Amino acid sequence: MKLKKFFALALAAATLALALTGCGSKAGDSADNSDANTDNQTGETVTVKLGVVGGIYDDLWAPAKAALADEGIDLEIVQFSDYVTPNNALANGDIDLNAFQHRIYLQNEIDNYGYAIQNIGNTFIIPLNLYSQKVSSVDELKDGDVVAIPDDLTNGGRALKVLEAAGLIELDPNAAFNPTVDDITSYKVNITIEELKANTIPSVLPDVAAAVVNGNYALDFGLKTDEAIYKDSVLDVEEYWNLIAARTADIEDPDTAAIYEKVVEAFQSSATEDVFNNTFGGYFIAVGWDQDLINQ
């Protein structure tokens, strides 16, 4: 990003404005004038590259992108086709921010690869609900029934927590937020758990007794939240909250941190919530917007 040039121009514009008016102003007013002059007089724009996974994020970030443009910030959405590359790209400086993962996934990436990146703002949580085309309630599931869950560690672990909350299994509490099937200590109903790729699970609903489906895939397949036989009850668990990530070194720079704070604030808006509710039928739920993670 052209941050040094951006702030040098902003300072020059603010100084000129003070000289012309010949009167004092509060620091906050001066900063506001500086931003306006940078946008309106010089036309200089700061570009922030945001890495995401999936076209759905274009819609989710559309209100923020429009709001930031008015402040002289061009939010460039950079699409990735997998969940491995975005953190590597962020750590290497190919992008400035990313927004595709929850806290558990980010921490696993940091632990495994040593990335110096961090959470700077909460975005949403996507429910993992239990669906069925064979039964209308959890109570109807019986011994021998097959229940499908995602096969990746983070979503699979969360799916097992859903099954536990639904009263189907018990998990070893020491497994915390990343349990595997090996951490099942007892079956309250002797179901068979089948681990599948998350994006394939909705298509196998006719063939299994029930399945835990990621909210984004449920949305793609036209599944409605009120059709679930059990709804995700762990929405208040912060470890499952999705987030915006940045390089730690950038957050330690006040000028860069100020730009990124605007990005977070632009996303955490009523306009974004309207997209959650009106475009995506409540599958995205705003969480943790009251937490200031940049200035903590």
Where in the sequence are the language-model features?
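Short, well-ordered beta-strand elements
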Residues: 43-55, 73-79, 146-147
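A bilobed periplasmic-binding-protein/Venus flytrap-type ligand-binding module shared by bacterial periplasmic
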Residues: 127-138, 240-258
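A conserved helix-loop-strand patch within extracytoplasmic ligand-binding domains
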Residues: 120-169
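Bacterial lipoprotein signal-peptidase II cleavage site
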Residues: 20-42
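Sec-dependent N-terminal signal peptides of Gram-positive bacterial secreted proteins and lipoproteins
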Residues: 2-26
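Periplasmic-binding protein-like
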Residues: 157-164, 265-288
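Ligand-binding "clamshell"
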Residues: 108-120, 134-135, 207, 212, ...
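Short helix-initiation/N-cap motifs at beta->coil->alpha
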Residues: 77-88, 175-203
